[in-house]
Amino acid sequence: MSLKFTNTLSKKKEDFISINPNQVKIYCCGVTVYDLCHLGHARSYLNWDVLRRFLIWKGFEVKFVQNFTDIDDKIINRANKEGCSTDELSERNIDEFHKDMDTLSILRPTSMPRATKCLHQIINFIEELEQKKVAYSSNGDVYFSVNKHKNYGKLSGREIENQIDNAAGRLKTNQKESKKNSLDFALWKKSNSGEVSYSSPWGNGRPGWHIECSAMVKQELGESIDIHLGGSDLIFPHHENEIAQSEACNGKELAKYWLHNGMVNVGGEKMSKSLGNFTTIRSLLEEGISPMTLRFFVLQTNYRKPLDFTQEALKAASKGWERLNNCLSFGYIYKIKDQAKNEIILDKPIKKSANTNLDKESFKLLSDFERYMDDDLNTSGALSILFELSQPIRKIINFLKEKDINEVDQDELNQVFYKWELLSELAAVLGLKVNLNHENPKNNPELDTNKIEELIKKRSLAKANKDFLLADKIRDDFKNIGIDLIDKPKGVTEWKQLSD
């Protein structure tokens, strides 16, 4: 089966054929750096991390560019509120972004351009649009003339006439005076008095949101790319406007394939900062949710579908990851492999290995894994293959609870180790990284008693508040690090370290 993606542009699943053989150019819309990232951001970037890892595994050379929007209204307002400069705010949140993404084992992009560092390219891009008569200046602003682009609406499927009526009702008084058409969008915005601004041929101001991405794509990857990525909330107007201005400027298709991930929902509503129903990545990690549990949770659902966030779903994902991690730990605990194989434990993308020692059943599972992933990144199907591969490993693990490894038939043991190597390779394609300390308390003998007592108090408070999901989660977390909790009368809880 050939690699297929659901292309938002064509509204159907298509065979993937890169512009240049064995090379893939990808652009992913990044964050506006005015605050910490939430689970919705994690969902998006985890999905695209797996896409990138899978393409590398299949032998493609991948150039992956993701931007930072480091100047816009939200950043200006937040900086004013905090009493700092927009540069200070952006720099701090870029650092925090990297911390979150590194913790989640998301590969860093090949390049991460920032809007404020690409002003020359942005201004040149706007000037080209003016020369082509598809942009016009008005009172210090510059707008893209939507009527001049005949294919406007081809990505979102929206009819331009309906959008004009809708946009007209939302215009401010000054916009009505400046725009020729209510749907025209800003390429350059005149700055208000006292606001951060940059010099340009049209006066002091700052770039519009959409033009940033078009200029950065052209600067980093060229006029046409293979894949453009983003959340489904960006299809209109952001990606629609990107297409319009890029194709008007360059006379070429901006991207062959447009992939969009579904939203994370909380109680039936999209998780977003504007609604105030968001949960930051940082807060989830501080609550004790492991990075790999978050990755596992996200990969259980196809990237295009909505993802419902509940504590119950997180708890189920934690148990699923724990089972898988037990099997991934097996080879490192019972057999020290060579250094090349040990690299699987690291956050490195890997290429498909020869797998010459696999039996017929394992070859079929390898083929099934690739078939699932080729089918529009069916990560839930791919995870099912990992669990099938885990079965003989789990059987050996259970056997070794009572017996010594030397009592296992050597040929059988060798086949199990070959399956473990394949399991480790395929898990790495999904970015699932084995956590040895998590499953083996002997690797982490020094226990922080103050932290233990603090968590026991937190669990007692959760029980008192009838938050039994949290109480059970804390108990499970203790078990995972080799600690057993014993509840006594009068609300007293004692703990002991489990024997190896």
From Swiss-Prot:
It is found in: Cytoplasm. GO terms for cellular component: cytosol. SUPFAM superfamilies: Anticodon-binding domain of a subclass of class I aminoacyl-tRNA synthetases (SSF47323), Nucleotidylyl transferase (SSF52374). GO terms for biological process: cysteinyl-tRNA aminoacylation. Belongs to the class-I aminoacyl-tRNA synthetase family. It is an enzyme of class 6 (ligase). Its main location: cytoplasm. The keyword Transcription regulation does not apply. Its EC number is 6.1.1.16. InterPro entries: Cys-tRNA-ligase, Cys-tRNA-synt_Ia_DALR, Cys-tRNA/MSH_ligase, Rossmann-like_a/b/a_fold, tRNA-synt_1_cat_dom, tRNAsynth_Ia_anticodon-bd. A motif ('HIGH' region) lies at residues 31-41. It catalyses: tRNA(Cys) + L-cysteine + ATP = L-cysteinyl-tRNA(Cys) + AMP + diphosphate. ATP binds at K273. Zn(2+) binds at C29, C213, H238, E242. Keywords: Aminoacyl-tRNA synthetase, ATP-binding, Cytoplasm, Ligase, Metal-binding, Nucleotide-binding, Protein biosynthesis, Zinc. This is Cysteine--tRNA ligase. Pfam families: DALR_2, tRNA-synt_1e.
